[in-house]
A protein has these predicted regions:
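Active-site-proximal helix-loop elements at catalytic-domain edges
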Residues: 59-89
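A structural-propensity feature for long, helix-poor, extended segments
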Residues: 125-126, 131-174
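Short, cysteine/histidine-rich loop/knuckle motifs that typically chelate Zn2+
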Residues: 1-7, 14-17, 24-27
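Conserved phosphate/anionic-ligand binding catalytic regions in large, soluble enzymes, centered on
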Residues: 66, 104-121
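Short, hydrophobic/aliphatic alpha-helical segments
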Residues: 1-7, 46-57, 88-107
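Cysteine-cluster motifs in flexible loop/terminal segments that predominantly coordinate metals
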Residues: 6, 25, 32, 180-209
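Polybasic, low-complexity association/targeting segments
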Residues: 39-71
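Short metal-binding segments enriched for Cys and/or His
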Residues: 19-39
């Protein structure tokens, strides 16, 4: 039973005291500030944009909101670099799909931040279950990201996996687009807030730079 809304559902995650908070309550109040910030953003670098969004007070250290943040940041960065699209329609569709991805998918489904990047690529290419030409692209992107995530290792960190997903997605997208997209190097400032931080094993840990 969710400790906030009191709805009952199956879960694999409770706190040390046995309390459970559902994904809807966990991310309540997150999506509107994120969407508002993205719509008004002019930042062209997707990693810098990701850091801005993750700095919003409504975004938690970990949580399912990152499944929507990754594809939304990718979409917004492309728009800001001149990629042609119907931005509002695409952003709405991305958020609708990403909110269906539950928390804990990194451990329970094995897809993590790659799921959001796959949603981004699916929307950008117009892919669907029966689309012959576009169908492979989201699959290939997700496989590239998952390989990188697995190489870095666990346990989960929504900040680390979001950054990796963004980096790999942009490198992948550059192969098929003439739009030039900048990609900075970033250092993590969240490691002290993450009890499971892998420290020197993380490519964004400050000591590694």
């Amino acid at each position: 039973t969710c400790s906030i809304c009191h709805k009952e559902q199956l879960t694999n995650t409770v706190c040390e005291n046995g309390h459970f908070v559902c994904d809807a309550c966990h991310s309540y109040g997150t999506y509107i500030p994120v969407s508002t910030a993205l719509r008004s953003s002019t930042e062209k670098d997707p990693l810098l944009l990701l850091e801005e969004i993750m700095d919003l007070p409504s975004v938690h250290m970990h949580g399912p909101e990152h499944h929507a943040i990754v594809p939304s940041v990718l979409l917004t960065a492309l728009r800001n670099n001149g990629e042609r699209m119907n931005y509002d329609t695409a952003l709405s569709e991305i958020c609708k799909r990403a909110r269906q991805v539950p928390g804990g998918t990194c451990g329970y489904w094995g897809v993590c931040g790659a799921a959001g990047a796959g949603i981004f690529m699916s929307v950008m290419t117009g892919s669907g279950p029966l689309h012959k030409d576009a169908w492979p692209f989201p699959q290939k992107l997700v496989s590239v990201i998952l390989s990188k995530l697995a190489d870095v290792g666990g346990p989960r960190c929504c900040k680390r996996t979001s950054r990796i997903a963004i980096e790999e997605a942009i490198r992948f997208y550059r192969q098929f687009s003439s739009v030039k997209i900048p990609l900075s190097s970033v250092l993590c400032k969240y490691f002290e807030d993450n009890k499971e931080c892998i420290r020197e094993d993380c490519p964004y840990y400050p000591v590694n730079k």
